[in-house]
Amino acid sequence: MKDKRIDKMRKLELLVPASSLEVLKTAVRYGADAVYIGGEVFGLRAKAKNFSLEEMAEGVEFAHEHGVKVYVTANILAHNADIEPVKAYFNDLKQVKPDALIISDPAIFTIAKEMLPDMELHVSTQANNTNYGTYNFWYGLGAKRVVSARELSINEIKEIRENIPEDMEIETFIHGAMCISYSGRCLLSSFMTGRDANKGACTHPCRWKYAVMEESRPGEYMPIEENERGTYIFNSKDLCMVEHIPELIDAGIDSFKIEGRMKTALYVATVARTYRMAIDDYLEEPKKYQANIPKYQEFISQCTYRQYTTGFFFGKPDETTQIYDSNVYEREYVYLGIIGEKVAENEYRLEQKNKFYVGQTIEIMKADGNDIEVEVVSIKDEEGNEMESCPHPKQQLIINLGRELEPGDILRVKSEEKQVNS
């Protein structure tokens, strides 16, 4: 049989999430080939900022100006009451003109195909895509791409590639949070809080602390592990495959997907630029990629994360995939904000995200990896009043870092606390 795996010199897609217009622009600037976003409905991320139709249109225009695609999620598991609103929503999307829709429900897929016949359709991981028969089924219905279930190994993905049409694309999550439930189909949130994970309102009870109680001893709660804090039995580590780009390419994956439609611009920029470097280095020269793995490891650890694992890629996860004794993030840097428009020499607008002060040494995070340490020269409020520090999140500021900056640059500072509660 002809080998249908991707030639390593082919341009691969790095697909990055965005929770807002600001984060979409960050994803584009820091290396995304495509960005996936959600509207205010039907997108499985109720707590994300998400996009109004106007913001979506602006985001699509910005991305297309930079040669980047935009995919819109509509991947809820639909009930009867959702059908007519979905039709109205798709009618609105005709004006937005995204590059593809990401869908999991067959009814929504059928509606999209009828209403948006020229739109590329991708099948969400929520559809539990675990075998090549499923891929061929969706291809027969008109899907261009299928997102593989997180439960697949590298070898299983490779076998799928060899048994589907050459023009069908495989998209795979290669970085980010992992759900303890099968491809995200979780009922814990609905049962415990009344908030439906399959409608985008998950409260993440998998991250909570649990203990056991023996039925003849009501009220006596015993930790499952010998630890006074209880145990986090459902608490998965985060997926990270930056050290395994060759294996991912060899498996025939077309699109490398980053999880995180609720993440900050700092997280998105950190992960996007690290994978951009890794992919480009490998395609340029595999030896260069191998030599730079320590750099990728360093860079990918500069975002907030929950320790790393390779998930299911190299076999079924064992006990090392879980975090049993805490529910904390590792944090190397604190996000300060994104540089806005220039207002005077060396002075720029900034919406502050975390506290910093005059005289403090901070970092300008650059898309090419050549970050710059600078000292904060001055901070002013919107009226031009000098400030020594800015303790209030989302305050509109004018800052001077003693040099010219580029709008869109991300500012960050080394974190004093290396672990923070989630």
Range-by-range predicted roles:
Residues 2-30, 34-41, 59-60, 66-76, ...:
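Surface-exposed amphipathic alpha-helical tracts and adjacent flexible/coil segments at the periphery
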Residues 45-64:
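Glycine-rich, positively charged N-terminal anion/phosphate-binding segment
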Residues 48-53, 81-89:
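Glycine-rich loop at the start of a catalytic domain that most often binds anionic cofactors/ligands
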Residues 72-73, 103, 123-125:
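Short beta-strand elements of ligand-binding domains
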Residues 84, 118-130:
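Gly/Gly-Pro- and Ser/Thr-rich, intrinsically disordered tail segments characteristic of DNA damage-repair
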Residues 107-108:
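Alpha-helix capping/helix-boundary segments
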